[in-house]
Design a protein with these regions (language model features):
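Amphipathic helical "hinge" segments at domain boundaries
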Residues: 47-119, 211
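Short acidic/polar active-site loop segments enriched in Thr and Asp
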Residues: 15, 61, 131, 189-190, ...
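Bacterial carbohydrate/catabolite-sensing allosteric modules
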Residues: 3, 10, 42-44, 91-104, ...
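Structural motif
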Residues: 66, 134-136, 255
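N-terminal helix-turn-helix DNA-binding module of bacterial transcription factors
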Residues: 1-62, 343-346
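Short beta-strand-centered segments that line the small-molecule binding cleft or hinge
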Residues: 118-174
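Short hydrophobic/charged patches on amphipathic alpha-helices used for structural packing
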Residues: 52, 122, 145, 180, ...
Length: 346
């Protein structure tokens, strides 16, 4: 007779659910208990039958990753989008770190939010192909959050603070605060913050972080500027700084919502003979792979994207195993990565 999960539980003196948590490598199990269960599994030669388990438990052993974005309607040949391309892929790179030694795989789906509240749910959710889903927040609306919650499929959001679901996020307000503070610390007094478009949920938090730094360091608010880009892209940054400079305002420092916007700004400044950091310093939020390849190399605030992905995976596994556990909400701690785009202090 084959060994069952009940046999393992009895031998290890734990519940069946604890054995299941160990098998799925859920990190909430005490290490002493985990080792005892693993030793019993090896001793008894227990092999989980995931196909049979899927039929009886309705589990797929798959997790979903949902990228929320808009259909690209611009025509620029450098229309890279940090929020819907590089940013989520860096988060995605961390999710498998949480799945090591589990039997879960990933299904990835891009979901356009352009079609309004009546559009179908993402296929992986509507067809119940996954046991849980990680949503890269971006354009994640309250309506979509509610519709996913109504399906009963566990979800963890990355990059925002939904009402109904667990989430992990960069601390957008603090990220912009310390970026602005960095420019102030080297003696800059006319600072422009180039924000993401206003339809992004983090727009207002980022704006608050900027003005909090300005006020805390007693800079004249009237000398500062905040611009919301039309596009969350390199083109958005290019057009925003072009409009600002043509208005006659010349900042000595620029903070941007993410590296993609910063690269568009850098391109415009280069084209118009404005030197970085001699004439204007620039710092961004994100610290993507793009930052080190900019000319000059872009100072940027690291928001720990890979770690956000790993934590999202861990939390989702916990939620699947323990549906009634308290809501989890966590934010990463940002740090400034100094490169060459900010001048030295006076």
């Amino acid at each position: 007779m084959s060994v069952t999960i009940i046999d393992v539980a009895k031998k290890a003196n734990v519940s069946k659910s604890t054995v299941s948590l160990v098998i799925n490598n859920v990190p909430t199990v005490k290490e002493e208990t985990r080792q005892r269960v693993l030793e019993v599994i090896e001793e008894l030669g227990y092999v989980p039958n995931f196909n049979a388990r899927g039929l009886t438990t309705q589990k797929t052993q798959s997790l979903g990753v949902l990228f929320t974005s808009q259909t690209n309607t611009t025509e620029s040949n450098f229309d890279f989008n940090c929020e819907t391309e590089i940013y989520p892929n860096d988060i995605l790179a961390g999710i498998p770190d949480a799945l090591v030694n589990t039997d879960y795989g990933l299904i990835i789906e891009r979901y356009s939010v352009d079609n309004g509240p009546d559009q179908p749910l993402p296929k992986m959710i509507a067809q119940r192909r996954v046991d849980g889903v990680i949503v890269i927040f971006g354009l994640y609306s309250e309506e979509l959050e509610r519709r996913i919650a109504d399906t009963g499929i566990p979800a963890v959001a990355v990059g925002g603070a939904p009402v109904l679901q667990d989430y992990v996020s960069a601390d957008f307000q603090q990220s912009v605060y310390i970026a602005t503070e960095k420019l102030i610390s080297v003696g800059l007094k006319k600072i422009c913050y180039v924000n993401c478009p206003p339809f992004f949920s983090s727009n207002q938090l980022r704006r608050i972080g900027f003005y909090r730094a300005i006020n805390d360091h007693h800079l004249c608010v009237e000398d500062q500027r905040v611009i919301d880009t039309q596009w969350n892209t390199g083109k958005g940054g290019y057009e925003a700084i072009k409009e600002l400079l043509m208005s006659g305002y010349m900042p000595d420092g620029i903070v941007t919502a993410h590296d993609g916007i910063a690269l568009g700004i850098i391109r415009y400044l280069h084209e118009n003979g404005i030197r970085i950091p001699n004439d204007v310093s620039i710092i961004s939020i994100e610290n993507s792979v793009l930052a080190g390849y900019a000319t000059p190399a872009l100072s940027s605030v690291d928001v720990n994207k890979r770690e956000l992905g790993r934590k999202a995976g861990e939390i989702l596994l916990q939620r699947i195993a323990q549906p009634t556990m308290p809501k989890v909400a966590m934010m990463s701690t940002p740090t400034v990565i100094n490169r060459d785009s900010v001048k030295q202090g006076e």
